[in-house]
């Protein structure tokens, strides 16, 4: 599918690279690890609203766990992803309100969602494609499904999305993995809902609305269902949350057609 009127026109330059993988192999994944940098760390993490959306959905599994590992400013080349998924201590315990240590059962991750630094895909000197191939192969060897999360353009550099989207889709196609179009949803929301600020004051990191939009797009892509009418709004005004839910589904559904 070309991203034409249905999504975005970029200064008359039509973006026509299509994602080859339309969904994940894991049916309704129960254990997910998100790996990246501050883009998914802000607002107490993108994983938290994603988990809440899943748990508030009447049709999805309630025994759902999602973890997040981030390094500030990190490229995927900084992250030892294979060591994270093989570490038996990740998610193995918690503490109650009285400081008692509670051991938890640890199940292997079904899916790992990763993203690179904001400029890595658009810099010719970066090793974006090489490192995604490495991580994808490592994960597939141990039975974990790799997924890419397309990052978003800076608020003051909207045309970044042209190269970002192309490089993320190209990398996904090269490795036969799913790419989630969070960046395209940001671009569309910036165009359609200019009064909803998806960014913090640095014009790069997500505001609470931006984090929620990202979670809604990931939800839509993983579960192939709309987050519309989900009662979890991440503390946003209901009208804003509902607009972002609807847009997330529209962008995701059209992206995979």
What are these regions (language model features)?
Residues 31, 41-126:
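Conserved SGNH/GDSL esterase-like catalytic core that processes O-acyl groups on lipids
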Residues 205, 216-257:
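Conserved catalytic region of serine esterases and O-acyltransferases that act on ester linkages
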Residues 35-36, 149:
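Short hydrophobic segments within beta-strands
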Residues 17-25:
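Cleaved targeting-peptide boundary
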Residues 26-30, 40-48, 122, 126-130, ...:
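Soluble non-cytosolic domains of exported or imported proteins
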């Amino acid at each position: 599918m070309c991203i034409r009127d249905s999504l975005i026109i970029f200064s008359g330059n039509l973006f026509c690279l299509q994602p080859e993988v339309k969904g994940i192999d894991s049916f309704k994944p129960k254990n997910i690890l998100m790996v990246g940098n501050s883009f998914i760390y802000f607002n107490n993490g993108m994983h938290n609203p994603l988990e809440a959306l899943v748990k508030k959905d009447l049709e999805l599994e309630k025994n759902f766990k999602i973890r997040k590992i981030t390094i500030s400013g990190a490229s995927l080349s900084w992250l030892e992803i294979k060591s994270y998924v093989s570490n038996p201590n990740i998610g193995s315990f918690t503490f109650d309100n009285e400081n008692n240590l509670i051991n938890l059962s640890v199940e292997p991750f079904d899916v790992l969602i990763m993203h690179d630094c904001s400029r890595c895909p658009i810099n010719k000197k970066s090793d974006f494609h090489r490192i995604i191939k490495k991580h994808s192969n490592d994960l597939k060897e141990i039975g974990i499904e790799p997924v890419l999360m397309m990052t978003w353009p800076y608020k003051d550099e909207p045309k970044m999305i042209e190269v970002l989207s192309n490089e993320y889709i190209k990398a996904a196609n090269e490795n036969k993995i799913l790419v989630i179009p969070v960046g395209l949803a940001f671009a569309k929301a910036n165009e359609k809902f200019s009064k909803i600020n998806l960014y913090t004051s640095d014009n790069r990191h997500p505001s609470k609305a931006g984090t929620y939009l990202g979670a809604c797009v990931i939800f839509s892509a993983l579960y192939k269902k709309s987050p519309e009418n989900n009662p979890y709004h991440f503390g946003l005004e209901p009208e804003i949350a509902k607009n972002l839910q609807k847009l997330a589904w529209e962008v995701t559904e059209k992206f995979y057609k």
